């Protein structure tokens, strides 16, 4: 038994390794890219639209509303990044219904990469709204004494994002393995359903936290323009 899909090495040449995490990550990305192309290739602005377009419009509308409720005044600016995070994590977790599939979100390297993308995006959005000087001033609020604490807080919350998602996904897998040894017939079905629900919740929480961090980084500019 292995704790992470990182341990499953499919190919190796010297220090180069191709593990299961990389394969499943690219598989999820290709699935999302292919699905997006199929859904958007025949978009219509008429009265009659396809079923898939209806689903897509519902998802986009809900995402924009949720981003706006967090406090961002222009949800469309942040929608591509936030929605991509949610769809990747949700799709990766929902694919656990496929036999033999192990979600890349069960790997600390994947969750760390997702958290790193948020860590990079937050100052970029903040600088775009407030300018470089305006954004850097937020680290000295409410007093310059708080500068080192704010910097440490920025780093630790990024680590928390990665560890939270990894820990929740890993604990779900471990519980499933334990219950399989107790009752191999009933518990797996119930735990798979619970696992899918947990995966969706974790995708939602990760996306919301990313939105909150971006809202905090852009709050100075939005306050000045309101």
From Swiss-Prot:
Name of the featured protein: ATP synthase subunit a 1
Gene this protein is translated from: atpB1
Q: Which PANTHER family match?
A: ATP SYNTHASE SUBUNIT A, CHLOROPLASTIC (PTHR42823:SF3)
* Record's keyword annotation contains Ion transport: yes
Where in the cell is the protein located? Cell inner membrane
Any one Gene Ontology MF annotation carried by this entry is: proton-transporting ATP synthase activity, rotational mechanism
Q: Which Pfam families does this chain map to?
A: ATP-synt_A
Quaternary context: F-type ATPases have 2 components, CF(1) - the catalytic core - and CF(0) - the membrane proton channel. CF(1) has five subunits: alpha(3), beta(3), gamma(1), delta(1), epsilon(1). CF(0) has four main subunits: a, b, b' and c.
Alphabetical list of InterPro entries matching this protein: Alt_ATP_synth_F0_Asu, ATP_syn_F0_a_bact/chloroplast, ATP_synth_F0_asu, ATP_synth_F0_asu_AS, F0_ATP_A_sf
An annotated GO cellular component of this protein is:
plasma membrane
Q: How does it sit in the membrane?
A: Multi-pass membrane protein
Q: Chief localization class?
A: membrane
UniProt keyword terms in alphabetical order: ATP synthesis, Cell inner membrane, Cell membrane, CF(0), Hydrogen ion transport, Ion transport, Membrane, Transmembrane, Transmembrane helix, Transport
Function, please? Key component of the proton channel; it plays a direct role in the translocation of protons across the membrane.
The record's annotation in Gene3D superfamilies points to:
ATP synthase, F0 complex, subunit A
GO BP term, example:
proton motive force-driven plasma membrane ATP synthesis
Bilayer-crossing residues are 20-40, 78-98, 113-133, 174-194, 196-216
Per the similarity annotation, which family is this? Answer: Belongs to the ATPase A chain family.
